[in-house]
Every structure is written in structure tokens, then in C-alpha cells.
Swiss-Prot record:
Record's signal peptide: 1-35
Organism from which the protein derives: Mus musculus
SUPFAM superfamilies: Class I glutamine amidotransferase-like
Record flagged with keyword Glycoprotein: yes
The entry's keywords: Endosome, Glycoprotein, Secreted, Signal
The protein's name: Glutamine amidotransferase-like class 1 domain-containing protein 1
Length: 220
């Protein structure tokens, strides 16, 4: 009977922020639900910190509450993750990414591996800021020459803390020699370039993750 077992599912690393600014509940729920159906999913945060969910609504509050009770809700330490063990990388929209992931040396090491091996990467909304940590020794960005999307300045400027943001993704991407596009604020907008999928905002989570699943499916 052993020979009739289904092949083991590929492993996907879901990286989220551990900062107080948190992780979008809407984006995380869609990421986790869609990805866990296709992958063996491992959640990781800097220091293994518990996730603070923001923008919790009536529609996802129960899911978030149930998730917190599960054993797999305790994230692994990003610092101890070996990127070579994973087939795909998924970063939901995390306002906190600007605080911790955007300057994470551990995530930079993982992203450099994924870039060199052309493994599928998907980053959404504020999670796109996490990609900014991955620079080469000469300070060039590993995604130079790629096309991306992420939060537009028009979306960011509506938040009260805009003036204090440590990083504007749109500016970083353009200054680093990559292409940036954005649609109207809150519109669904996804860019696929080679093995990199980016979504403009939390509303773009589902089609972005579907593109990640498509990329992984086409590699079998």
C-alpha cells in the first residue's frame, strides 16, 4: 500500500512580521488557507515572535481566534530557517514588515538563495517591503531588473504615519533599478515576472497566491 501514497507536498515558507505594526488579518487568512491546501506550510517570524493581526473584521475574527489556538500558530524563528528546505516563499501584507523584515539579514539570506535558484516567491502589499532587505555585497538589489508592484504612494499617504515610514517601497524599487507599477488605490493588481509574484495590496492576495500556486505547479 505504501507505493500508492500520494507524493509528499512541497514545502512553503510563510514569513510574517513580528513587529507591533502587525500583519493584515485579511491577507494572512487568504495566504494561509490557499497555501496550506497545496503545501506543507511553515510560518516564521523574526525571533519566532507571535503574530499581531491588524484590520481584524467580523468575517475573519473567528478564523484568527481559532488559528491562535492551533499548535502551528507558534511561528518558527526566521533566524534558524534554512531556505534550501523550501520550494516556495510567501509573504502576506504586513504593515510591520517595514520595521523588521525590510532590514532582516536572515530573510536576506533566504531571498538570495531563492533568487539564485529561481524558486517561486510571492510578496503582497506591505509585505513587498520585506524584499528590500536582499542586497548583494556591492549594495545592488537582488531583484534589480525585475518588474514589481506594491503599495502605491497614493495608498500609503492615507495612513496617519506616512511621514514616519522608514521606507517607501515604490521609491526603493525604482531607485534600485527595478520596474514598479501600481493601479488605483485598493484595486486588485498583480505582477508576475519570472519566479517573482507581487500584489499591490491586501485585496490582491488571492490572485497573487494563485499565481504562486501556478508557478509551483508548472515546475513539477
Amino acid at each position: 500500500m505504501a507505493s500508492e501514497r500520494l507524493p509528499s507536498r512541497p514545502a512553503c515558507l510563510l514569513v510574517a512580521s513580528g513587529a507591533s505594526e502587525g500583519v493584515s488579518a485579511q491577507s494572512f487568512v487568504h495566504c494561509f488557507t490557499l497555501a496550506s491546501a497545496a503545501f506543507n506550510l511553515q510560518v516564521a517570524t523574526p525571533g519566532g515572535k507571535a503574530i499581531d493581526f491588524v484590520d481584524v473584521t467580523e468575517s475573519n475574527a473567528r478564523w484568527v481566534q481559532d488559528f491562535r489556538l492551533k499548535a502551528y500558530a507558534s511561528p518558527a524563528k526566521l533566524e534558524s530557517i534554512d531556505g534550501a528546505r523550501y520550494h516556495a516563499l510567501l509573504i502576506p501584507s504586513c504593515p510591520g514588515a517595514l520595521t523588521d523584515l525590510a532590514s532582516s539579514g536572515s530573510l536576506a539570506r533566504i531571498l538570495q538563495h531563492f533568487r539564485s535558484e529561481s524558486k517561486p516567491i510571492c510578496a503582497i502589499g506591505h509585505g513587498v517591503a520585506a524584499l528590500c532587505c536582499a542586497t548583494n555585497e556591492d549594495r545592488s538589489w537582488v531583484f534589480q531588473g525585475y518588474s514589481l508592484t506594491g503599495p502605491s504612494v497614493y495608498e500609503l499617504i492615507r495612513a496617519p504615519g506616512f511621514a514616519r515610514l522608514p521606507l517607501i517601497v515604490e521609491d526603493f524599487v525604482k531607485d534600485s533599478g527595478a520596474g514598479f507599477s501600481a493601479s488605483e488605490p485598493d484595486a486588485v493588481h498583480v505582477v508576475l515576472d519570472r519566479h517573482l509574484v507581487t500584489g499591490q495590496n491586501a485585496n490582491s492576495t488571492v490572485p497573487a497566491v494563485q499565481n504562486l500556486l501556478f508557478l509551483c505547479g508548472s515546475r513539477k
